[in-house]
Design a protein with these regions (language model features):
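Intrinsic disorder/low-structure terminal segments
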Residues: 3, 14-18, 210
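Bacterial N-terminal signal peptides
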Residues: 9-23
Length: 221
C-alpha cells in the first residue's frame, strides 16, 4: 500500500535523518538538512522515501549558481532526495521523471526533466523573453546553442548540482536538483506533482509502485 506523508499538512511533523552517500550526494550542514526537510513534500513506500522541495526563492540559485541562474531563464530547480531504507539497491530511471502540471480541470501537461546539457541550452538561448505572453502549452525541450567555454562552465555547474547517481545503495541516500523549464510560470508549481514512475529493486528485479508527490504541499522556498 502506498503511503503519502506531507510534513506541513494535518499538523504532522516528520523528522527524517538524511544519510548522504560519499561523493555522489550534496553535503549540506545539519541545520540546512533540517530546514530542507521541514519544507519538503514526501512520499514513502516499499523501502524508498522521496522528498522534494521546489526552489522558488531566487536567493537559493544565487548561492548555488555563480555563472547563470536557471531561475532567471524561466526554469525551476526541484531539490530531490532519494532515501533507500531497504536491504536492496534501488535504481531510479531519472530520464522518466516528469512534472505533471494541472492547468485547468480539463487540461494537464507533463513536463520532462532537463539534463544539464539541455538546461544549459535553455539558459544561454538568444533573444529576449516576453514574460507577459501566455505560454500554454509549455514547449518540450529547448533550442540548440553554440557550446563554447561559457556553455561548458554553465553546464558544469548544473551537472554538479544535479542528481549525480541513479543507483541508491542499501540504507543510503542520493540528493540533487532536477530542472524543469516552466517558462517563468512558477505559480504552476502549486498545482504540480513530481511523477517518478520507474524505480527497480535490483537484486529482486522488482519494480516499485510509482511515486507522485504534490509540490503544492511543500513549503515555499
Amino acid at each position: 500500500m502506498r503511503k503519502v506523508y506531507y510534513n506541513l499538512a494535518l499538523k504532522l511533523t516528520l523528522f527524517l535523518p538524511v544519510f548522504l552517500s560519499g561523493d555522489i550526494a550534496l553535503r549540506p550542514c545539519a541545520a540546512q538538512q533540517q530546514a530542507s526537510l521541514k519544507a519538503s513534500a514526501l512520499e514513502s513506500h516499499e523501502g524508498m522515501t522521496i522528498s522534494v522541495r521546489p526552489w522558488t526563492d531566487p536567493a537559493l540559485y544565487k548561492e548555488k549558481f555563480h555563472k547563470k541562474s536557471p531561475y532567471a531563464a524561466g526554469m525551476v530547480a526541484v531539490q530531490v532526495n532519494f532515501r533507500n531504507d531497504s536491504d536492496d539497491s534501488m535504481k531510479v530511471n531519472l530520464e522518466r521523471i516528469r512534472l505533471n502540471v494541472t492547468l485547468s480541470d480539463e487540461e494537464r501537461q507533463a513536463i520532462d526533466s532537463l539534463t544539464s546539457e539541455q538546461a544549459a541550452d535553455v539558459i544561454l538561448k538568444p533573444g529576449a523573453k516576453n514574460i507577459g505572453k501566455s505560454r500554454f502549452p509549455i514547449p518540450i525541450g529547448g533550442p540548440k546553442v553554440g557550446r563554447d567555454k561559457k556553455w561548458t562552465e554553465v553546464e558544469e555547474e548544473l551537472r554538479q548540482a544535479g542528481v549525480r547517481a541513479s543507483v541508491i545503495a542499501p540504507h543510503s541516500s542520493v540528493e540533487g536538483l532536477l530542472y524543469f523549464d516552466v517558462r517563468s510560470q512558477f505559480e504552476l508549481l502549486s498545482n504540480s506533482k513530481l511523477y517518478v514512475p520507474d524505480i527497480v529493486a535490483l537484486e529482486k528485479n522488482h519494480g516499485l509502485m510509482f511515486f507522485e508527490i504534490d509540490l503544492g504541499q511543500a513549503g515555499a522556498q
